[in-house]
């Protein structure tokens, strides 16, 4: 499992990367956007998922409790899974 895998169910968003599995309740998601900052440094408290170096795209998931930055080279696939 090299990249980030995202699966959306009726109630939650499941993000898998390496041995980590993060579940985010859909009711907590405020916004999903492309992050234009380098290495996701705008929000220093955000949880970073993926390899920051060697990736071209960043996706920011803002939630009620925590923000997540996904480092990927396949943003279209991840955004399609999130917005499905």
From Swiss-Prot:
Highest rank taxon of the organism: Bacteria
InterPro entries assigned to the protein according to its UniProt record, in alphabetical order: PH_SunI-like
Family of the protein in this entry: Belongs to the UPF0457 family.
Record-given protein name: UPF0457 protein BALH_2270
Organism name: Bacillus thuringiensis (strain Al Hakam)
């Amino acid at each position: 499992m090299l990249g980030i895998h995202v699966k959306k169910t009726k109630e939650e968003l499941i993000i898998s990367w390496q041995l980590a599995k993060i579940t985010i309740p859909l009711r907590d998601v405020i916004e999903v956007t492309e992050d234009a900052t380098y290495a996701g440094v705008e929000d220093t408290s955000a949880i970073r998922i993926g390899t920051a170096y060697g990736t071209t795209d960043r996706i920011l998931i803002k939630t009620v409790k925590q923000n997540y930055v996904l480092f990927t080279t396949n943003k279209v696939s991840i955004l399609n899974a999130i917005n499905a």
